[in-house]
């Protein structure tokens, strides 16, 4: 199958799959909505119109959780700053990425010695990584590595099987960095890793900004099987609405007093603050005192609407 596919291939009966022509599937795990319009100066972000098919979705880069409840899916505006684009992962998505290893050239086309695998919670899934030597035409010159996310009761396990096939086309050992994105931090207190059934000592870290738990295992033979177990499972992280709304307002080019009023309303009302944000537009002030003016740019409201209505 092609790596890039239009949405209407999977959703031929849904009108939105035809309407948003810039959005596409990327592989089996991701939806991508490129930003093709200029940024709005007032919010210092640009937006893409997005259609999310029915179900649960995660922002690939920061792990924020989105819910699309209607059978016809959901349309929204996704606002991002200069170094980001809207990319959404399905529940259970498994996405391998190349990482530069020490001593490796950044532009090397060899199969990497270091890999990052980004994994999302919410559903069981499996993914097979296929690698060749860059010249092979026959299947017998490919190596395959099976990865799987499984749940049993309250526990979860992510596994990386030993490589099979033409293993001479891949490194003899690898550094694995497995990033579980969009999960609650409590998972890091009950993580255990094994290599071929023997206990390993992984490096474990949690990044609150991207809601990501990272487990790193170094110099693991590609002939070995890895298992990462979570006794308490992989719970989806709480939605950091207040922190994300604060970030939008902090960057916005608008009157400071209006920022304070908007943030106070969001802290007190949550998503119910959205209808009130437009009422903060008052360029007349009180009498002749312009210091009481309030200006609430529409793009700022739109960016806040995304944050407030993700779920």
Task: Place the predicted regions along the sequence by residue.
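Beta-rich accessory regions
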Residues: 103-311
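Catalytic core of carbohydrate-active enzymes
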Residues: 1-190
